[in-house]
Amino acid sequence: MSKEIKTQVVVLGAGPAGYSAAFRCADLGLETVIVERYSTLGGVCLNVGCIPSKALLHVAKVIEEAKHANKNGIYFSEPRIELDEVRAGKEAVVAKLTGGLAGMAKARKVTVVEGLATFTDSHTLVARDRDGNPTTVKFDNAIIAAGSRPVQLPFIPHEDPRIWDSTDALKLKEVPKKLLIMGGGIIGLEMGTVYNALGSEVEVVEMFDQVIPAADKDVVGIYTKQVEKKFKLMLETKVTAVEAKDDGIYVSMEGKACNDTKRYDAVLVAIGRVPNGKLIDAGKAGVEVDDRGFIHVDKQMRTNVPHIYAIGDIVGQPMLAHKGVHEGHVAAEVIAGQKHYFDPKVIPSIAYTEPEVAWVGKTEKECKQEGLNYEVAKFPWAASGRAIASECSEGMTKLIFDKDTHRVLGGAIVGSNGGELLGEIGLAIEMGCDAEDIALTIHAHPTLHESVGLAAEVFEGSITDLPNAKAKEKIISI
């Protein structure tokens, strides 16, 4: 049975970018419809991405902490892992959050349409549910938040159930004895953390000379030193062939770490994501989509068609939920007639591994590429009382300052729960703070958070928790 809906705004996709845009539109008094292919709101992030992976990472952390509790005189027997119960726990987390979104959509009177949507013209789209039943949506304005999907390589037999993408890995159907992860990025390393804790022998193959290539090498080096105790990293090595056989998946590699064919019980392909721009017939609405599937927008998130906007993964890197949320707010407010635009100074990035690798603002490699006059200040967690007491002293807080103005350009943290410490650094960059502003802010002791203030003291030459390389310089200047 076909239906037709007329609305002021339709949002295509209900991930963090999409539902944030829809809810903001509704809050601003706009009649809003949201179209989503999943049976629940939340998109990839809540259903098969950010949230379920964090639930499993929490399980992994509990397992690892129990293993090492004997250092403090607490002894646990070998954990008995019931996959069905672990899976149920993960799904309960997802259900709680997606259920909350459904309640908020209802409270805001946002109409939810389930189905895959495609444009038919610049003011119409059609969403088809699982049975093929169409719902036609006539709109004044549209916000495209159609997201992205995992990259698939033509030489890999992706149809084999032992070859996974990130969605498959999160299903937790089994714990393979030997798991290869193709790609040393955030998604691959997070899932490697989970499966290693659950009992898999994990190997990671990465083309670049470091994992998490976007982060600075000194930051990643601290992570690498710890993770190599758990699973094997094969850097500067590429996969040349993948063959599925009855007794396993055979992967041929060549490069610095391996020139051989190895057998695995499962392979996780985590080499990035591609935008869904070519899957929604955007061209029928007049919206331009580039060869890669991205839709280009201006600072108000407008496409080349003035009443059609795009947000989230589909508009370009970084493909991060928190970026998409802010883009969604901008699009909604512009449609409502407000003067708003998207121009953040910083977008934080976090690998929720153990330890976490997190950074915000400019990296040191970016400063070098841009020819900036900068200075780095580092505070090692080996000098942090809280880190030592919490047995996570193999970490570091790093700040990057403009050498002339002393303003904060960027920062990175590697350590347990390091991502939780990024907020102050991001705010400092947005507000134009300098090193003195941070150093003179009293940070609670003992906390991991105080490492940010102590790194600023290193730059200022006022540090007393470490040998002060600038002490003599300061005395002379007086």
UniProtKB/Swiss-Prot annotation:
Pfam families on file: Pyr_redox_2, Pyr_redox_dim
GO process annotations (BP): 2-oxoglutarate metabolic process; pyruvate metabolic process
PROSITE patterns recorded: PYRIDINE_REDOX_1 (PS00076)
Cysteine pairs bridged by disulfides in the record: 45-50
Residues binding FAD: 36-45, 54, 117, 313, 321
Protein location: Cytoplasm
Role noted for this protein: Lipoamide dehydrogenase is a component of the alpha-ketoacid dehydrogenase complexes.
Full protein name: Dihydrolipoyl dehydrogenase
